[in-house]
């Protein structure tokens, strides 16, 4: 086995046989009869199960991307916890105001920026597989411009947050603290508009370790920054917000320096011209549904907190919900990293015209996701009587947490495969299908079940989690149905059409399916009929 380096122009972990396979594809002529014979042979691979060695090789390939990505996720999670600790150090009012502002920022800003940035993932991943390197640079420029333009109206909403919160009936003191926090956090929006595309740009080229190292350095500096601004300079809530901004600034500087000084950009760099403002149809057709999908899932948890406030003893239920959401956020790091890894693998393979390899990646990743779900479920059941003690000593909150944790574990059993499935759909450039599945599962199934069990059947706090369980089970089932019916040859053809763009030409609107495949791509139509 001869593996390429992560930063090389070829996909990682390709065997010598695979490289020969690539060279055949590069030199073949589609009008040559041998090309059809090659495609017919490839069709046989699209119907068989991968061998043990193929599966092991794919696990290694996904692990090289997902492993460092998981470490990066854990580091970012620890950064959020450090910020919460310093807010708690300032007092109960500051903790409440900071928590409220972060929730508002998640709904109105961070979810939007994160979701829109992921629209570039299939384009860059497939372009890297197809060796259309200039398309990576052009897509990076377009995505940064898109995110920066979206950050401006979001900033204005943050400037008026106090008025919005008071209109919603929030406490005046807490609203004032939240307004102060967000006022100093506005630069974070513009930094994330650079940071998210940079990370995706590197990951789609199988470059992940430098991102992890840069994140580790930034998080290590996050503690002294908070100490200096909050404790020494006594800047209060503003100090916590400024520390968050400076940490992201450090990360942007470190990643930009890596890209520049290692010449990672040399093959992908496109001069900034008027072309950056043209041909946005393909990017927007992916970014908008991806953003909708991300926002639908993020917003669900905020709605759950609102519903908790309507239950008996809202103080205990809201506190317990906060603990459990922090727990699911920690667990989510692992399926999310697997999702990002498989998205990169599938987009690379489809771009390189290897649909059989993309199918293998899907199969292996789903088995890995099921294993992760089982581990998460066992973990939740085993720690149900002890986990809450890490956050509080209140007996009622501890009781609610211990009752709900096994249900949370069952939710993760569905969440891990469905999150991985979303990664597969992103790699195939099919985010609209993922958005429709999320909409139907969380809001047409999960929300009614949560209200029914929580309030009508008087199950209270656990009833709300039954709603999430119903949503995750539905989402995983629909996602599995869509993936099993995927025509991988069609997806390779779509990838070829997407990556045939060249700088200077406006790309066509990305099709849902090519004209050849309308009879074989009924999954999308079926899902739209069911869920919209």
Swiss-Prot record:
Topology in the lipid bilayer is annotated as: Multi-pass membrane protein
Indicate where this protein is primarily found: Golgi
Q: What InterPro entries does the entry give?
A: MATE_euk, MATE_fam
Knocked-out gene: effects: No visible phenotype.
Under the heading Pfam families, the entry gives: MatE (PF01554)
Q: Where in the cell is it found?
A: Golgi apparatus membrane; Late endosome membrane
CDD domains in the cross-refs: MATE_eukaryotic (cd13132)
Q: Where is the composition biased (Polar residues)?
A: 514-523
Q: Which GO terms describe its cellular component?
A: Golgi apparatus; Golgi membrane; Golgi transport complex; intracellular organelle; late endosome; late endosome membrane
Recorded GO terms, molecular function?
antiporter activity; iron ion transmembrane transporter activity; xenobiotic transmembrane transporter activity
Task: Name the GO terms of the biological process aspect.
Answer: iron ion transport; regulation of plant organ formation; response to abscisic acid; response to absence of light; response to heat; response to nematode; response to osmotic stress; root morphogenesis
Q: Which keywords does this Swiss-Prot/TrEMBL entry list?
A: Endosome, Golgi apparatus, Membrane, Transmembrane, Transmembrane helix, Transport
Membrane-spanning segments: 65-85, 95-115, 136-156, 174-194, 211-231, 235-255, 279-301, 322-342, 363-383, 397-417, 437-457, 464-484
Q: Give the span(s) annotated as Disordered.
A: 496-532
The recorded induction information for this protein reads:
Induced by excessive iron, but repressed by iron deficiency. Induced by heat, darkness, osmotic stresses and acid abscisic (ABA).
Which tissues show it? Highly expressed in shoot apices relative to leaves. At vegetative stages, highly expressed at the stipules. At reproductive stages, most highly expressed in the mature pollen. Also expressed in the tips of sepals.
Query: What else is noted?
Result: Plants overexpressing DTX48 in initiating leaves are short, produce leaves much faster than wild-type plants and show enhanced growth of axillary buds. Overexpression of DTX48 alters shoot developmental programs leading to a loss of apical dominance phenotype.
Which function does this protein serve? Functions as a multidrug and toxin extrusion transporter. Contributes to iron homeostasis during stress responses and senescence. Could be involved in specifying the lateral organ initiation rate. May act as a negative regulator of hypocotyl cell elongation in the light.
- What is the similarity comment for this entry? Belongs to the multi antimicrobial extrusion (MATE) (TC 2.A.66.1) family.
Q: What is the name of the protein in this document?
A: Protein DETOXIFICATION 48
Upper classification of the source organism reads: Eukaryota, Viridiplantae, Streptophyta, Embryophyta, Tracheophyta
């Amino acid at each position: 086995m001869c593996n390429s380096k992560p930063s090389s122009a070829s996909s990682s972990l390709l065997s010598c046989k695979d490289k020969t396979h690539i060279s055949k594809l590069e030199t073949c002529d589609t009008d040559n009869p041998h090309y059809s014979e090659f495609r017919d042979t490839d069709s046989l691979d699209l119907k068989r199960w991968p061998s043990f060695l193929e599966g092991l090789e794919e696990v290694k390939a996904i692990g090289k991307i997902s492993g460092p990505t998981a470490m990066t996720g854990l580091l970012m999670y620890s950064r959020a916890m450090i910020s919460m600790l310093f807010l708690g150090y300032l007092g109960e009012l500051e903790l409440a105001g900071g928590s409220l502002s972060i929730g508002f920022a998640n709904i109105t800003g961070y979810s939007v920026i994160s979701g829109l940035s992921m629209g570039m993932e299939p384009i860059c991943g497939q372009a890297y597989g197809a060796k259309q390197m200039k398309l990576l640079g052009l897509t990076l420029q377009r995505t940064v411009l898109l995110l920066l333009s979206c950050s401006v109206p979001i900033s204005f909403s943050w400037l008026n947050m106090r008025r919005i919160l008071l209109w919603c009936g929030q406490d005046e003191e807490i609203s004032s603290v939240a307004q102060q926090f967000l006022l100093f956090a506005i630069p974070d929006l513009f930094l994330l508009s650079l940071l998210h595309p940079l990370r995706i740009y590197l990951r789609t080229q199988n470059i992940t370790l430098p991102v992890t190292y840069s994140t580790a350095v930034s998080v290590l500096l996050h503690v002294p920054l908070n100490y200096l601004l909050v404790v020494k300079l006594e800047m209060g809530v503003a100090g916590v917000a400024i520390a968050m901004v400076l940490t992201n600034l450090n990360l942007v500087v470190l990643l930009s320096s890596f890209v520049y000084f290692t010449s990672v950009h040399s093959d992908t760099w496109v001069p900034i011209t008027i072309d950056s403002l043209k041909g946005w149809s393909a990017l927007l057709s992916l970014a908008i549904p991806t953003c909708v999908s991300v926002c639908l899932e993020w917003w669900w948890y905020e709605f759950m907190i609102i519903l908790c406030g309507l239950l008996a003893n809202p103080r205990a239920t809201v506190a317990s919900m906060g603990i459990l959401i922090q727990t699911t956020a920690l667990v989510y790091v692992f399926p999310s990293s697997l999702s990002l890894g498989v998205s990169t693998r599938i987009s690379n393979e489809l771009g390189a015209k290897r649909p059989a390899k993309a199918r293998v990646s899907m199969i292996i990743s789903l088995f890995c996701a099921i294993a992760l779900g089982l581990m998460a479920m066992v973990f939740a059941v085993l720690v149900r009587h002890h986990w809450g003690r890490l956050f509080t000593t209140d007996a009622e909150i501890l009781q609610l947490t211990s009752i709900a944790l096994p249900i949370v574990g069952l939710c993760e059993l569905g969440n891990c495969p469905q999150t991985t499935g979303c990664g597969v759909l992103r790699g195939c450039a099919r985010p609209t299908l993922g958005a429709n599945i999320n909409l139907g599962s969380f809001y047409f199934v999960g929300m009614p079940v949560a209200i029914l069990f929580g309030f009508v059947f008087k199950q209270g706090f656990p009833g709300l989690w039954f709603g999430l369980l119903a949503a995750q089970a539905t989402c995983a089932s629909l996602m599995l149905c869509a993936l099993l019916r995927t025509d991988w040859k069609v997806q390779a053809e779509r990838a070829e059409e997407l990556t045939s763009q060249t700088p200077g030409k406006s790309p066509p609107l990305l099709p849902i399916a090519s004209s050849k495949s309308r009879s074989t791509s009924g999954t999308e139509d079926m899902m739209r009929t069911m869920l919209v």
